[in-house]
Each structure stands twice: as structure tokens, then as C-alpha cells.
Regions:
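Positively charged, Gly/Ser-enriched RNA/tRNA-binding surfaces
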Residues: 1-136
Length: 136
């Protein structure tokens, strides 16, 4: 088996099952890590701070979903990753995606660490979503 200790496999399975609102996910992950004796205080505090920052900007954070199974398909991502979606007449459409990639420049030959974040915004999809929702 990939993970020999069934207790560890159970914790991983429970963690990967966390999915729902971001606030609900934080609560579930805090409980899971506390019960398992895993210290994730700093990353969970960072996520809470991100949500608070979004709330201070007027973002409805109750509409932000979290899925522990989510990940971007690029190996250079090293931390927080995200996608922004909207719903159009044909269903969900991705508007943007990105994340943190602190080792990418070293992978490309930089001789020292360079922290980096970035995203791709699909402008034509954003404009189409705004038009569909009655925006300019």
C-alpha cells in the first residue's frame, strides 16, 4: 500500500474529503488536525486571513468553495492555488486561475530563490460573464 499506517491513511482520506464553504472547510480541517495531532496552525491562519481580507473588500466569502482534493496541474505551484468560476447559460466557465510558485524561477535557472504569485485571467470570458449578468 502507498501508506502503510492505516491511521495515517485514514487522516489523509478524511482530509481529502473536506469540501464545502471555505469557512466550513477551515472548521473541519482544524478539528481533523487537532484530533490527529497535526500542527497546521500557520497555514490555517493564513487561509483565515485571506478570507478576512476578501470580506473587507466586500467579497461574499460564503460563496467561496474549498475542496481539499483541488490542485492545479502545473508542477511549479508551491502553495495556495485558486480558480475563479462563473456560471453562464451553458454552465460553469473558468474565468481565472493561478497561485503561488516560489521555485519556478530557480527551475528556470535563477541562482537564488524568488517568491512569486500569478494568475491567468481570461478577459473574453470575464467580459462575456459581465454582459450576461447585465453589466457593461
Amino acid at each position: 500500500p502507498l501508506v502503510a499506517d492505516p491511521r495515517i491513511a485514514g487522516v489523509i482520506t478524511r482530509l481529502l474529503a473536506v469540501s464545502g464553504s471555505a469557512e466550513q472547510a477551515l472548521t473541519e480541517i482544524r478539528a481533523l488536525t487537532r484530533d490527529a495531532g497535526i500542527a497546521l496552525d500557520a497555514p490555517l491562519a493564513a487561509m483565515q486571513a485571506r478570507l478576512a481580507a476578501l470580506q473587507s473588500l466586500g467579497v461574499a466569502t460564503d460563496k467561496i468553495s474549498f475542496a481539499a482534493r483541488f490542485g492545479r496541474n502545473m508542477e511549479y505551484y508551491t502553495g495556495f492555488v485558486f480558480e475563479l468560476w462563473a456560471r453562464d447559460k451553458e454552465g460553469p466557465v473558468q474565468l481565472a486561475g493561478g497561485g503561488r510558485y516560489d521555485t519556478l524561477l530557480e527551475m528556470l535557472g535563477a541562482n537564488h530563490p524568488v517568491t512569486a504569485i500569478g494568475c491567468a485571467i481570461r478577459t473574453e470570458r470575464v467580459l462575456a460573464a459581465r454582459r450576461q449578468q447585465g453589466g457593461a
